[in-house]
């Protein structure tokens, strides 16, 4: 029996302006080389741009975008008897949100545009409207999981 104690989950702090944990998760994923102030600047500029474009609350747009991109299932490679199967696995909401944020940021980096703030804002607006690269990634993952549903018993 293990003698290790149960590790407590770290609580995610909220950001200074919106006082929201999702915002802090997003900023931490934008972060590069420890430059958190730059990550905050990029994110807040993106939120300002969303407010100008949509005339709506940017925080609700962010929530809606993350909700629409969050996957229910993902696929894991599992090796059984010399062959590798793509096994569909249900994921928890926290992990789904983390994946959604990753996909949103990756899709916004691929976009053509002036700077990261503009690209991020347009990707968030598109995701809130159920279009864009991040939504396509979610649908592709769900399609793969559906196609490999026969291997679900390998979990």
Swiss-Prot record:
GO terms for biological process: ribosomal small subunit assembly; translation. InterPro entries: Ribosomal_uS7, Ribosomal_uS7_bac/org-type, Ribosomal_uS7_CS, Ribosomal_uS7_dom, Ribosomal_uS7_dom_sf. SUPFAM superfamilies: Ribosomal protein S7. PROSITE patterns: RIBOSOMAL_S7. Disulfide bonds: none annotated. The gene is rps7. One of its GO terms (molecular function) is rRNA binding. This is Small ribosomal subunit protein uS7c. Keywords: Chloroplast, Plastid, Ribonucleoprotein, Ribosomal protein, RNA-binding, rRNA-binding. One of the primary rRNA binding proteins, it binds directly to 16S rRNA where it nucleates assembly of the head domain of the 30S subunit. Part of the 30S ribosomal subunit. Belongs to the universal ribosomal protein uS7 family. It is found in: Plastid, Chloroplast. It comes from Physcomitrium patens (Spreading-leaved earth moss). One of its GO terms (cellular component) is small ribosomal subunit.
